[in-house]
C-alpha cells in the first residue's frame, strides 16, 4: 500500500517505516531468502530460495564420507565461480500484513532453476495486475541439453490452481534431438516452423491492464549474443508481436506505460545507451540522444513520467525524470 519498505537482512524478509523506524521481521526461514516480490494487492509475496541439488555432483560419496572432493557425473556442474550444488526456486506465500506463511514452490519436484543462474534475479518473475497469476522465466532442461542450450521460456502460473502454461511453445511441444558435438546453427532446433521462441526469453512484465505480457526474446538457440527483441504476447488471442524491430540493436530493459499501449526501452546505438518509445504496432522513436548511457528504466508511479539512471565516462550514476 506504499506505507512500508520491505527489505532483506541476513536472509530474512523485513519491513519498516520509510524513516527507518518500526523494523519488523516477517520470516524465519531455515533457507535464506535471496529475493522477493509482493503482489499488487499486498496479500501475497514471491520468495526466492536456493534448494540443495545434486543432479550432476555427488559430494562426499558414501564410501568416502570424509572426502572433500566432488564426483562429477554430468553437465552442468559449474557456473563461473561456483559449483552447482543448489538451485533457486520461487515460492509463493500469503501475507496478512504481519507474517508470511503458507509457502508453495512453483517448481515443486522439478529439477529446474528460476531465476536462471548465474545472473538472474527476481526481475525474471512478474505478478499480474490482479495478483492471480505469476509469469516466470525458466529453462526446463537438465544435463548436457541444459549446458548447451539457451532456450528459456516464459511460463504463466495460476496461483489458485497451480497450473502452468508455456507462452513460448504450444502444448505438447517436444524439442528435437540435438547433437552436442556440432554447431546449433544448422540443427533442426533452429529451423522450426511456426511462431516458436527458441532462444533466451527472459524478464516478463504484464501490461497495467493485464491483457498483455512483454518480455525480452532472442531468436536462436545456442546463440548467447543474439539480439534481444521485445516480444508482446496477447493473453486473449495468443498472438505475439515484436515491437522494437525498427531499432536494429538490443532491447536492454523496458517498462510499460499506464495506457498499456506504449512501451519504453533502452538500447545501445553508436556506443551510447539511449531511451526509446514503441507501441503495439512497432512504431519506434527516440526519446533521448545523449552521449551518455541509461542503465535502468521504470515508470514514476502514475505520473506518466519515466525514472531512469544515467551515467557517462565522466559522470557517475544519477537519477533523472524524463517526460516522454
Where are the model-predicted features located?
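Residue-level detector of Asp-centered blade-edge/turn motifs that repeat once per structural unit
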Residues: 1, 40-41, 129-130, 208-209, ...
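Predominantly five- to eight-bladed beta-propeller fold
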Residues: 47-109, 137-140, 144-155, 184-189, ...
Amino acid at each position: 500500500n506504499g506505507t512500508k519498505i520491505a527489505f532483506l537482512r541476513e536472509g530474512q524478509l523485513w519491513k519498516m517505516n520509510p524513516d527507518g523506524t518500526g523494523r519488523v521481521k516477517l520470516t524465519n526461514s531455515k533457507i535464506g531468502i535471496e529475493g522477493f516480490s509482493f503482489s499488487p494487492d499486498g496479500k501475497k509475496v514471491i520468495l526466492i530460495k536456493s534448494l540443495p541439488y545434486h543432479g550432476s555432483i555427488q559430494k562426499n560419496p558414501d564410501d568416502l564420507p570424509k572426502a572433500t572432493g566432488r564426483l562429477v557425473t554430468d553437465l552442468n556442474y559449474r557456473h563461473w565461480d561456483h559449483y552447482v550444488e543448489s538451485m533457486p526456486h520461487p515460492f509463493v506465500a500469503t501475507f496478512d500484513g504481519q507474517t508470511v506463511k503458507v509457502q508453495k514452490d512453483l517448481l515443486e519436484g522439478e529439477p529446474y532453476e528460476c531465476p536462471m543462474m548465474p545472473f538472474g534475479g527476481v526481475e525474471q518473475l512478474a505478478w499480474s495486475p490482479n495478483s492471480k497469476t505469476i509469469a516466470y522465466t525458466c529453462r526446463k532442461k537438465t544435463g548436457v541439453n541444459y549446458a548447451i542450450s539457451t532456450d528459456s521460456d516464459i511460463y504463466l502460473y495460476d496461483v489458485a490452481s497451480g497450473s502452468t502454461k508455456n507462452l513460448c511453445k504450444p502444448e505438447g511441444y517436444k524439442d528435437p534431438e540435438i547433437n552436442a558435438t556440432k554447431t546449433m546453427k544448422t540443427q533442426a532446433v533452429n529451423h522450426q516452423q511456426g511462431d516458436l521462441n527458441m532462444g533466451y526469453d527472459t524478464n516478463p512484465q504484464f501490461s497495467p491492464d493485464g491483457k498483455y505480457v512483454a518480455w525480452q526474446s532472442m531468436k536462436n538457440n545456442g546463440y548467447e549474443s543474439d539480439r534481444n527483441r521485445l516480444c508482446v504476447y496477447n493473453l486473449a488471442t495468443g498472438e505475439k508481436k515484436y515491437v522494437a524491430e525498427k531499432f536494429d540493436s538490443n532491447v536492454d530493459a523496458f517498462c510499460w506505460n499506464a495506457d498499456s499501449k506504449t512501451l519504453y526501452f533502452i538500447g545501445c546505438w553508436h556506443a551510447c545507451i539511449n531511451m526509446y518509445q514503441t507501441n503495439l504496432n512497432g512504431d519506434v522513436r527516440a526519446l533521448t540522444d545523449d552521449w551518455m548511457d541509461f542503465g535502468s528504466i521504470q515508470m514514476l508511479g502514475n505520473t506518466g513520467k519515466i525514472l531512469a539512471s544515467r551515467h557517462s565516462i565522466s559522470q557517475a550514476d544519477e537519477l533523472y525524470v524524463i517526460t516522454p
